[in-house]
Amino acid sequence: MSTINNTRDIKNVMVRKASGEEEKFSTKKLIASLERAGADFDVIDHIVNDVHSWIFDGVTTRKIYDRAFSLLRSNKFATASRYGLKKAILEMGPTGYPFEHLISRVMELGGYSTQTGIVVDGFCVTHEVDVIATKNKQQVLVECKYGQSAGRVVSVKVPLYIHSRVNDIIRKRQTLPEFEGFSFQGCIATNTRFTTDAIDYAKCNNMWLLAWDYPVGQGLKDIIDRERIYPITVLNNLNKAQKQQLMEVGVVVCRQIHAEPKVLDSLQLTSRKLSALLNEVKNICG
């Protein structure tokens, strides 16, 4: 059996990211992503050596991902599902509604009670807030920016705009007796990334940002992997139409299926297909 060299990168091989930027290929990054997906040593060893055998200058990170996913899938279904997390979130569209519910679940894991898609009064005008999260007289007003392209970035224009909206809502709520003693904070959540200017502006104005890999170690991918709140779009035993049907009735994360398998009744799956799906869900949720 071959072994992985954990310290060696393929020297001078440049890969192209979804944004069009180029960076040196890192074996360490590939290993880390496979470990997060739950792949065991032998599977990681096989995939890394496979990638080393064909990687070339200018190859896209998507091509590397697709190859790794294919090899994972041939070894372990649930592991492949978790490795496909970024792609799965990109498949939650075309509307941002399922993503809003995913973010709502993330906030609930932090001890917040949540509401989604709420129209509220500001001091000057009314506003629709994607997620309102409340805990111990602290209220977070969340704007969700869902992107269906991995290369998309959220520019400084977004926190500039959201900051003014949040301030209008806060100004109104500070006049209402039911919000006496409350503190408020604006938040922007995205499945993509923020520009440096967007991050700087948000920090300067006490806004909470949540992106795919921001804050470092506490980004969306980290929370989902740690808490195992995977969207149903990771599931290999459901087709696109079936996933869409479930999301339309509010079934957005695998935990919902794990807790209440009856939500699948409307799909009219065969007993064999249902058994395979529930087994995949069980393995994913842990």
What are these model-derived regions, one by one?
Residues 16, 143, 258:
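Residue-level detector of conserved, well-ordered beta-strand and adjacent loop positions
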Residues 45, 97, 237-240:
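Amphipathic alpha-helical repeat elements characteristic of tetratricopeptide repeat
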Residues 38-41, 68, 72-230, 247-248:
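Intrinsically disordered, low-complexity Ser/Thr/Pro/Gly-rich regulatory segments
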Residues 46, 119, 214, 258-259:
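Proline- and acidic/polar-enriched loop/turn elements at helix boundaries
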Residues 103-106, 225-286:
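C-terminal extensions
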Residues 25, 39-42, 59, 154, ...:
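Short coil/turn linker and secondary-structure boundary residues
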Residues 1-92, 99:
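Long, C-terminal-biased catalytic regions of enzyme "large/alpha" subunits
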